[in-house]
C-alpha cells in the first residue's frame, strides 16, 4: 500500500481536544444567540414603552425642551429632515431616559472619564465649569468702555469686582491632570487695562477661606451665599464699605437644588442646599421690577424654589433693571452693572445704600444718564463672574450706547 494513502488513527487525546473545541464553539454560539435575543427583546420593549408613553415637553433635570414627534410631510421626506427629527425625537423621548443618562455617567466615571459635556467630573461630587479663554478683543472693548464711562462720571466712585469660577479657586476638587487656566492672572491682566476704577480680584479672598462651608455649589456654576458673604467681608474696603456687617441670621431655603452643571453633565442624583444670610438689624426695603411693573418686600422669590432653576430665588432671576429702595439713610446710592453672581451678593449691600439700581447689560437697552440722575447715584460697581466678563460682548455695548 502506498504510504501516502496510509491513515494514521486519531488518538483519544486528540479526539477529546476536538470534542472540547466543538462543545466550546456550540456554547459560544448559544450564548451569542441568547445575548442577541435578549438585546433585541430589550430594545423592542423599550421602543414599545417609548411609543406608548406620552411625549414629555420639558426635561426638568436637563432644563430644556424636548423634541416632539415630527409630522410627516413631502418636504421633510425629500430633504431628509424628517428622519433626523425622528431620531432626535426617539433620543429625547426614550423610556427611562434620565436613568440611562445617569447610568452612562456612572460608567464614564468608572472608566476614568474626567468630563461630561464640557463639565469636569470633580472630586467630592463637585461638577466644575471650565475656565474660559479670554477674548482679548472683547476685553479691550470692555476696558475702553469702562474707562470712558468712569471718566465721563468722574464725580462718582467707580469700582469693579471680578469673581473667579470654582475650578480656579478649588483646584483640589478637579479630576487629575485636568487643564485649567490661571484665572486669577487673567483677572489681574484685565484689571491692569483700567484707569480711574478701583479694581478688586476676589480670587485671594476665596482661596484663603478656611471655613468648611461651600463657597460654590457642587452642581451649579454660581457661588453660594456663603461664598458671596466671604468676599463681602474680606473685600469690603475695596468696595467702599468701611464697616461691613459681621452678624447674620442664617436660613436654609432648599435641600433639592440641581444646578446648571448637573443638568449639563447628566449628573442628576446629587442635590445642593441653598442658604441665605440676612444681615442682623437689616433696614427695611422694597424691590421694584420695572420689566414687570411689580413691587415686593423681599429680595427672595420663594416660588422659584418650586421650579427647576432654584437659584432664581435670588431676585427671581435676571432682569434688565431692578430697583431696591432702603431705609438705610446713608446718603449713598449705588448703580450695579452685573451678571447673575450679583443676585446673591446684593443681600449684603442693603445696609450700606439708600438706593441700589441693578442693571444687566445683556437685557438693558436704554440710556444710563437718566438712571444716574433720577436716582442720585453716588457709586458705581461692576460685579461680574470671570467666566462672563472675560468673554463678554454686552457690557461695552451698553456703556457705549450712553456715551
What is each of the regions a protein language model found here?
Residues 1-403:
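Extracellular glycan-modifying ectodomains
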Amino acid at each position: 500500500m502506498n504510504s501516502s494513502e496510509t491513515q494514521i488513527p486519531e488518538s483519544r487525546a486528540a479526539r477529546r481536544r476536538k470534542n472540547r473545541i466543538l462543545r466550546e464553539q456550540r456554547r459560544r454560539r448559544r450564548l451569542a444567540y441568547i445575548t442577541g435575543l435578549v438585546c433585541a427583546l430589550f430594545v423592542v420593549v423599550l421602543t414599545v414603552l417609548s411609543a406608548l408613553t406620552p411625549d414629555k415637553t420639558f426635561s426638568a433635570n436637563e432644563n430644556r425642551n424636548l423634541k416632539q414627534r415630527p409630522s410627516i410631510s413631502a418636504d421633510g421626506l425629500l430633504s431628509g429632515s424628517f428622519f433626523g427629527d425622528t431620531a432626535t425625537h426617539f433620543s429625547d423621548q426614550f423610556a427611562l431616559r434620565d436613568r440611562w443618562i445617569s447610568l452612562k455617567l456612572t460608567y464614564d466615571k468608572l472608566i476614568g472619564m474626567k468630563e461630561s459635556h464640557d463639565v469636569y467630573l470633580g472630586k467630592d461630587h463637585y461638577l466644575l465649569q471650565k475656565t474660559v479663554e479670554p477674548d482679548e478683543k472683547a476685553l479691550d472693548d470692555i476696558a475702553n468702555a469702562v474707562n470712558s464711562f468712569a471718566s465721563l462720571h468722574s464725580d462718582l466712585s467707580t469700582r469693579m469686582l471680578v469673581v473667579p469660577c470654582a475650578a480656579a479657586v478649588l483646584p483640589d476638587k478637579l479630576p487629575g491632570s485636568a487643564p485649567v487656566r490661571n484665572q486669577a492672572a487673567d483677572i489681574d491682566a484685565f484689571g491692569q487695562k483700567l484707569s480711574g476704577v478701583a479694581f478688586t480680584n476676589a480670587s485671594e479672598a476665596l482661596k484663603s477661606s478656611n471655613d468648611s462651608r461651600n463657597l460654590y455649589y457642587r452642581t451649579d456654576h454660581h457661588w453660594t451665599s456663603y461664598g458671596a458673604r466671604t468676599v463681602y467681608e474680606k473685600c469690603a474696603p475695596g468696595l467702599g464699605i468701611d464697616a461691613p456687617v459681621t452678624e447674620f441670621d442664617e436660613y436654609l431655603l432648599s435641600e433639592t437644588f440641581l444646578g446648571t452643571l448637573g443638568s449639563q453633565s447628566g449628573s442628576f442624583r446629587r442635590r445642593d442646599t441653598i442658604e441665605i444670610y440676612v444681615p442682623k438689624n437689616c433696614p427695611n426695603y422694597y424691590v421694584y421690577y420695572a420689566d414687570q411693573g411689580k413691587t415686593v418686600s423681599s429680595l427672595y422669590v420663594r416660588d422659584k424654589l418650586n421650579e427647576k432653576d432654584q437659584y432664581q430665588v435670588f431676585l427671581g432671576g435676571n432682569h434688565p433693571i431692578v430697583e431696591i429702595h432702603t431705609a438705610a439713610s446713608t446718603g449713598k446710592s449705588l448703580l450695579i452693572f452685573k451678571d447673575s453672581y450679583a443676585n446673591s451678593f446684593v443681600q449684603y449691600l442693603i445696609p450700606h445704600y439708600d438706593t441700589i439700581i441693578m442693571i444687566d447689560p445683556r437685557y438693558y437697552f436704554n440710556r444710563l444718564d437718566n438712571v444716574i440722575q433720577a436716582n442720585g447715584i453716588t457709586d458705581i460697581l461692576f460685579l461680574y463672574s470671570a467666566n462672563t466678563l472675560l468673554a463678554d460682548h454686552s457690557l461695552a455695548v451698553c456703556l457705549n450706547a450712553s456715551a
